[in-house]
């Protein structure tokens, strides 16, 4: 079943730490995005890591990718995650959601 895999505690800690470092890196160095390899993390683990950091998930209607998710947290950047199953490209960026004011 899609997305039913549950991470072990050590794996969840690794993913949460990796996601937290990636978010800090995106903000500190003002880079556009970070690409993850499928050896690093899969889309569901990345989603779980962001949720563990207090971000709320919402889906996008953008059909260019297999997954295009938004994660929001009060007083924080919106985080966009997209995954292309053809290329295994998993990308995370800080973005402005269409509902947010610039």
Across the structure, where does each feature detected by a protein language model lie?
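N-terminal trafficking/processing presequences and adjacent post-cleavage segments
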Residues: 1-43
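Acidic, low-complexity, intrinsically disordered interaction modules
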Residues: 29-102
